[in-house]
Amino acid sequence: MKKILKLFKLSSFFILILIILSRAYALETKHVDIWSDGTRMSGDIFFPLGFNIDVPNPAIIMAHGWGGKRSDLNRYFVPKFVKAGFIVLTFDYRGWEDSDSRLVIIGDQPEIDQNGEINVYAKAIREVVDPIDQTRDIFSALDFLCGEEGVDTERIGLWGTSYSGGHVIYVAAQDDRVAAIYSQVSYQGNGRNIRKNFYRQRAIEKARGVIDPIPQGIDIIPKLLGSPDLAKMLGYRPIDWAYKITVPTLIVDVEQEELFDRKKNGLSVYNIIKNNAVSKYHTFPGTHYDIYYQYFEASTNLAVQWFVKYLK
């Protein structure tokens, strides 16, 4: 009986230690609503241990890739950046996860009443991949973060992966509030032009009302979540903005990238940026999705080290 009691006490002691440690490393967070062109986006802000609003803190905005969701960022990526001393903001693009939908009026627009209001039937737009709207959402997230107490607006970084790896280049090139960039396995708009005529045909069909103004359920790419708005993708080329980047930028690729030509995208962007800013290009072996599994730890550590070096 004494041995049992002793084991029970030891077990209780170790459980208590684990609880204390888990609380010590628990992330302080709050849910936030971010407004982007009149539509609410759902987001989360995470704060480092010992956060003090009276002391300006460096911050990072994380943008997930094609069909991604912030909950995955929150679970796997965010803790590493927060433990390194950063405030982190994540969000879901409009029309994804628990962010509100963009709305399109069904039928003819009713007459406007004396208060300037109308009652309409509308279609909720969900899970459409629109690079123009998504980059607008990142700008809105940046606006929101700059109004958050305790954020040093001179030390804000952008982290983007896959399709959003191009978005962060596009945004940073146009917004001088961005102080550092990390972009991994990124498509920079420098792809093959064999489908350009089809993209243009989709734009014609939208303008003439042949297809929905924001098409859903068409042109879906196998194994990828969401409907691409091909008309919006036609002229979207972050690489064309790379020459305006003047802040430290780390580009990470995989050597056997199978979704696009990395040399025409990530490497080409690096070769442009290096002329005007501190920059680095790094590759891992493997294919696109290996960055999230086999090379998750190594790539994320590179990102943390980059932001520590240039934001802290």
Which residues does each PLM region occupy?
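Primarily recognizes the serine-hydrolase "nucleophile elbow" in alpha/beta-hydrolase
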Residues: 139-205
